[in-house]
Amino acid sequence: MATTNQLIRKGRTTLVEKSKVPALKACPQRRGVCTRVYTTTPKKPNSAMRKVCRVRLTSGFEVSSYIGGEGHNLQEHSVVLIRGGRVKDLPGVRYHTVRGSLDCAGVKDRNQSRSKYGTKRPKK
Protein backbone atom coordinates (compact mmCIF):
# COMPACT_ATOMS: atom_id res chain seq x y z
CA MET A 1 0.00 0.00 0.00
CA ALA A 2 1.40 3.41 -0.95
CA THR A 3 1.67 6.18 1.61
CA THR A 4 -0.05 9.54 1.09
CA ASN A 5 3.32 11.17 0.45
CA GLN A 6 4.23 8.59 -2.21
CA LEU A 7 0.88 9.14 -3.95
CA ILE A 8 1.38 12.91 -3.95
CA ARG A 9 4.84 12.49 -5.48
CA LYS A 10 4.06 9.78 -8.04
CA GLY A 11 0.31 9.23 -8.34
CA ARG A 12 -1.41 6.13 -9.64
CA THR A 13 -0.74 5.09 -13.23
CA THR A 14 -3.91 4.23 -15.14
CA LEU A 15 -3.76 1.10 -17.25
CA VAL A 16 -4.17 1.84 -20.96
CA GLU A 17 -6.57 -0.59 -22.64
CA LYS A 18 -5.19 -1.85 -25.96
CA SER A 19 -7.71 -2.14 -28.81
CA LYS A 20 -8.42 -5.63 -30.15
CA VAL A 21 -9.32 -4.13 -33.54
CA PRO A 22 -6.77 -1.35 -34.21
CA ALA A 23 -7.39 -1.23 -37.98
CA LEU A 24 -10.96 0.04 -37.47
CA LYS A 25 -9.59 3.20 -35.77
CA ALA A 26 -12.53 3.43 -33.30
CA CYS A 27 -15.17 3.02 -36.05
CA PRO A 28 -17.83 0.28 -36.03
CA GLN A 29 -17.00 -0.84 -39.59
CA ARG A 30 -14.52 -0.01 -42.34
CA ARG A 31 -14.58 -0.31 -46.12
CA GLY A 32 -11.76 -2.01 -47.99
CA VAL A 33 -10.68 -3.71 -51.20
CA CYS A 34 -9.86 -7.43 -51.34
CA THR A 35 -6.26 -8.02 -52.35
CA ARG A 36 -6.39 -11.81 -52.02
CA VAL A 37 -9.19 -14.35 -51.47
CA TYR A 38 -8.08 -17.77 -50.22
CA THR A 39 -8.82 -20.71 -47.91
CA THR A 40 -6.81 -21.73 -44.88
CA THR A 41 -6.87 -24.51 -42.30
CA PRO A 42 -7.70 -23.94 -38.60
CA LYS A 43 -5.66 -24.73 -35.49
CA LYS A 44 -5.13 -28.22 -34.07
CA PRO A 45 -8.35 -29.93 -32.88
CA ASN A 46 -10.44 -28.51 -35.76
CA SER A 47 -10.37 -29.38 -39.45
CA ALA A 48 -11.90 -27.37 -42.31
CA MET A 49 -11.14 -25.05 -45.21
CA ARG A 50 -11.95 -21.61 -43.82
CA LYS A 51 -12.66 -18.84 -46.33
CA VAL A 52 -10.51 -15.75 -45.70
CA CYS A 53 -9.67 -12.59 -47.62
CA ARG A 54 -6.84 -10.11 -47.29
CA VAL A 55 -8.27 -6.57 -47.31
CA ARG A 56 -6.63 -3.16 -47.81
CA LEU A 57 -8.71 -0.77 -45.69
CA THR A 58 -9.46 2.94 -46.15
CA SER A 59 -7.61 3.48 -42.86
CA GLY A 60 -4.42 2.29 -44.59
CA PHE A 61 -4.14 -1.08 -42.83
CA GLU A 62 -4.03 -4.44 -44.60
CA VAL A 63 -5.83 -7.11 -42.57
CA SER A 64 -7.14 -10.67 -42.87
CA SER A 65 -10.91 -10.99 -42.69
CA TYR A 66 -13.08 -14.08 -42.30
CA ILE A 67 -15.93 -14.69 -44.76
CA GLY A 68 -18.78 -16.38 -42.85
CA GLY A 69 -21.60 -18.50 -44.29
CA GLU A 70 -21.81 -21.10 -47.03
CA GLY A 71 -20.46 -19.88 -50.37
CA HIS A 72 -19.40 -16.36 -51.36
CA ASN A 73 -18.89 -14.23 -54.47
CA LEU A 74 -15.74 -12.31 -53.48
CA GLN A 75 -12.87 -11.87 -55.93
CA GLU A 76 -9.63 -9.93 -55.93
CA HIS A 77 -10.91 -6.35 -56.40
CA SER A 78 -14.23 -6.70 -54.54
CA VAL A 79 -15.13 -3.84 -52.18
CA VAL A 80 -16.15 -5.17 -48.77
CA LEU A 81 -17.24 -3.90 -45.36
CA ILE A 82 -15.23 -5.14 -42.37
CA ARG A 83 -16.35 -5.40 -38.75
CA GLY A 84 -14.45 -6.51 -35.67
CA GLY A 85 -14.61 -10.02 -34.27
CA ARG A 86 -11.88 -12.61 -34.28
CA VAL A 87 -12.01 -16.25 -35.39
CA LYS A 88 -10.73 -18.34 -32.49
CA ASP A 89 -9.19 -21.15 -34.55
CA LEU A 90 -7.55 -18.94 -37.22
CA PRO A 91 -4.45 -17.14 -35.89
CA GLY A 92 -4.15 -13.56 -37.13
CA VAL A 93 -7.77 -13.25 -38.33
CA ARG A 94 -9.33 -10.53 -36.16
CA TYR A 95 -12.03 -9.20 -38.50
CA HIS A 96 -15.21 -10.42 -40.22
CA THR A 97 -16.61 -9.36 -43.59
CA VAL A 98 -20.18 -8.06 -43.41
CA ARG A 99 -22.36 -10.21 -45.67
CA GLY A 100 -25.01 -8.53 -47.83
CA SER A 101 -23.30 -5.13 -48.04
CA LEU A 102 -21.25 -3.52 -50.84
CA ASP A 103 -19.85 -6.23 -53.17
CA CYS A 104 -20.34 -9.13 -50.73
CA ALA A 105 -23.64 -10.90 -51.44
CA GLY A 106 -25.74 -12.48 -48.71
CA VAL A 107 -25.92 -16.25 -48.19
CA LYS A 108 -28.35 -17.97 -50.57
CA ASP A 109 -31.28 -20.06 -49.25
CA ARG A 110 -30.68 -19.04 -45.64
CA ASN A 111 -33.78 -19.15 -43.40
CA GLN A 112 -32.45 -18.81 -39.86
CA SER A 113 -30.16 -16.08 -38.46
CA ARG A 114 -30.65 -14.23 -41.77
CA SER A 115 -29.60 -10.81 -40.46
CA LYS A 116 -26.12 -12.12 -39.65
CA TYR A 117 -25.65 -13.32 -43.23
CA GLY A 118 -27.31 -10.49 -45.20
CA THR A 119 -30.18 -12.59 -46.52
CA LYS A 120 -33.54 -11.02 -47.42
CA ARG A 121 -36.81 -12.44 -46.07
CA PRO A 122 -38.04 -15.26 -48.33
CA LYS A 123 -41.23 -14.72 -50.36
CA LYS A 124 -44.21 -16.78 -49.21
From Swiss-Prot:
List GO terms (cellular component aspect).
small ribosomal subunit
User: Which keywords label this protein?
Assistant: Methylation, Ribonucleoprotein, Ribosomal protein, RNA-binding, rRNA-binding, tRNA-binding
Q: Which GO terms describe its molecular function?
A: rRNA binding; structural constituent of ribosome; tRNA binding
Q: Which Gene3D superfamilies match?
A: Nucleic acid-binding proteins (2.40.50.140)
Origin superkingdom: Bacteria
Question: Is tRNA-binding found in the keyword set?
Answer: yes
Q: Which cysteines are joined by disulfide bonds?
A: none
Matches recorded under CDD domains: Ribosomal_S12
* InterPro entries in the cross-refs: NA-bd_OB-fold, Ribosomal_uS12, Ribosomal_uS12_bac
Q: Which GO BP terms apply?
A: translation
3-methylthioaspartic acid sites (modified residues): 89
Q: How does it assemble?
A: Part of the 30S ribosomal subunit. Contacts proteins S8 and S17. May interact with IF1 in the 30S initiation complex.
The record's comment on protein family reads: Belongs to the universal ribosomal protein uS12 family.
What this protein is reported to do is described as: With S4 and S5 plays an important role in translational accuracy. Interacts with and stabilizes bases of the 16S rRNA that are involved in tRNA selection in the A site and with the mRNA backbone. Located at the interface of the 30S and 50S subunits, it traverses the body of the 30S subunit contacting proteins on the other side and probably holding the rRNA structure together. The combined cluster of proteins S8, S12 and S17 appears to hold together the shoulder and platform of the 30S subunit.
Q: By its UniProt entry, which PANTHER family does this protein fall under?
A: 30S RIBOSOMAL PROTEIN S12 FAMILY MEMBER
What is the official name of this protein in its record? Small ribosomal subunit protein uS12
